[in-house]
């Protein structure tokens, strides 16, 4: 069964809304791990809208499971990753005007650049995951650049408004997952997953880890982080 990476970006979003010192994402990560999180995920954006450099530095020192650093494939971010050495990096697309990551990374269209970044990071013993749509060409390109992982973008599945569309998107993810595993990639997934839609994705053969943030932090506002994480672990198990 898939494991759970808890994205704590939105703890930082609340903090940055008032430009203050609380709530602290580092404390949130501790509570998430106490609740059963298998990993902690943060996205250090170029505009620093939520997670800050200080957060990543402290999380590297305090996280006891594993730290997944989401970032754009820029020279600045590569330098930060090489300095901090997270347990792995997930390369994601990034636009300043977006509210959240809107789609998968286009590996096909920038294969030389992505290949260069993957090589730099993995030569420093930092495994790389690529956040992509479950399209055959993108999966093939991920193999070519020698990434260790892909993270399948589950946004269209999560946003499906009827059961027929949802099943079509789930089948698309299942096919992509199978293709990737056959090609030697390890497979994670994330984006838009909630307590109510997570199980079918978690149950896909070979699915390793689900990176989930907003729905957990939303639930945590009502019941606390530890309980919110425990409930998501139950949802992943289909309980």
From Swiss-Prot:
GO CC, alphabetical: cytosol
UniProt binding sites for 1-deoxy-D-xylulose 5-phosphate: 9-10, 45, 50, 100
InterPro entries reported for this sequence: Aldolase_TIM, PyrdxlP_synth_PdxJ, Pyridoxine-5'_phos_synth
Residues annotated as site: Transition state stabilizer: 151
Localization in the cell: Cytoplasm
Catalytic activity field: 3-amino-2-oxopropyl phosphate + 1-deoxy-D-xylulose 5-phosphate = pyridoxine 5'-phosphate + phosphate + 2 H2O + H(+)
A single GO BP: pyridoxine biosynthetic process
Protein's pathway: Cofactor biosynthesis; pyridoxine 5'-phosphate biosynthesis; pyridoxine 5'-phosphate from D-erythrose 4-phosphate: step 5/5
Entry function: Catalyzes the complicated ring closure reaction between the two acyclic compounds 1-deoxy-D-xylulose-5-phosphate (DXP) and 3-amino-2-oxopropyl phosphate (1-amino-acetone-3-phosphate or AAP) to form pyridoxine 5'-phosphate (PNP) and inorganic phosphate.
NCBIfam families per record: pdxJ, PRK05265.1-1, PRK05265.1-3, PRK05265.1-5
Assembly and binders: Homooctamer; tetramer of dimers.
Homology family: Belongs to the PNP synthase family.
PANTHER family: PYRIDOXINE 5'-PHOSPHATE SYNTHASE (PTHR30456:SF0)
Full protein name: Pyridoxine 5'-phosphate synthase
Organism: Trichormus variabilis (strain ATCC 29413 / PCC 7937) (Anabaena variabilis)
Lineage of producing organism: Bacteria, Bacillati, Cyanobacteriota, Cyanophyceae, Nostocales
Gene: pdxJ
């Amino acid at each position: 069964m898939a494991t759970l990476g808890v994205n704590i970006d939105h703890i930082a979003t609340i903090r940055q809304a008032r430009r203050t010192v609380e709530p602290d994402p580092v404390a949130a990560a501790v509570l998430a791990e106490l609740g059963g999180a298998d990993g902690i995920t943060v996205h250090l954006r170029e505009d620093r809208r939520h997670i800050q450099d200080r957060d990543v530095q402290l999380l590297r020192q305090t996280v006891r499971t594993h730290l997944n650093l989401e970032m754009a494939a820029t020279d600045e971010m590569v330098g930060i990753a090489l300095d901090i050495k997270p347990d792995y990096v997930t390369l994601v697309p990034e636009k300043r005007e977006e509210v959240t990551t809107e789609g998968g990374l286009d590996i096909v269209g920038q294969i030389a650049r992505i290949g260069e970044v993957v090589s730099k990071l993995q030569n420093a013993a930092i495994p790389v995951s690529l956040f992509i749509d479950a399209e055959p060409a993108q999966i093939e390109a991920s193999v070519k650049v020698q990434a260790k992982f892909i993270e399948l973008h589950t946004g269209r599945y999560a946003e499906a408004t009827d059961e027929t569309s949802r099943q079509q998107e789930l089948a698309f993810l299942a096919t992509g997952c199978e293709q990737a595993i056959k090609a030697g990639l390890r497979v994670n997934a994330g984006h838009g997953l909630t307590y109510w839609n997570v199980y079918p994705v978690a149950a896909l053969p070979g699915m390793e880890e689900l990176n989930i943030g907003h729905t957990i932090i939303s639930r945590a506002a009502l019941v606390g982080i530890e309980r919110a994480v425990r409930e998501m672990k139950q949802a992943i198990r289909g309980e």
